Amino acid sequence: MAIFLSAITAPTWAQFTGQGAQVATPTVAEILAKPVDGQMVRVQGHLLSKIKSETYTFSDGTGEIVMEIDDDDFPKQPVSEKTKIEVVGEVDTGLRRPPEIEAESVRVLP
């Protein structure tokens, strides 16, 4: 009986494998040129400035894009314009504005 219960309650680590499961690694210039609303992306670069609460200008050296980063997703260590970071987030397009990235996770790179 104990073996049966442990088999039922054992954790599983299944992953979604359908459309959109992979995280793309385009440059900011590529995102700006051909934005795909809802596309998950991974970018590396620097925050250049804070525009307003939870809104920043980000650059990877190929271009600049507005990035929304919730305070809860911000790294614990201080981040300046010299700190290299990696952001995984979702491209958000709008009718009357350039594309943005809504960050899901942010980490400081060595």
Protein language model features and the residues they cover:
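Bacterial N-terminal signal peptides
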Residues: 1-8
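OB-fold and OB-like single-stranded nucleic-acid-recognition modules
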Residues: 10-110
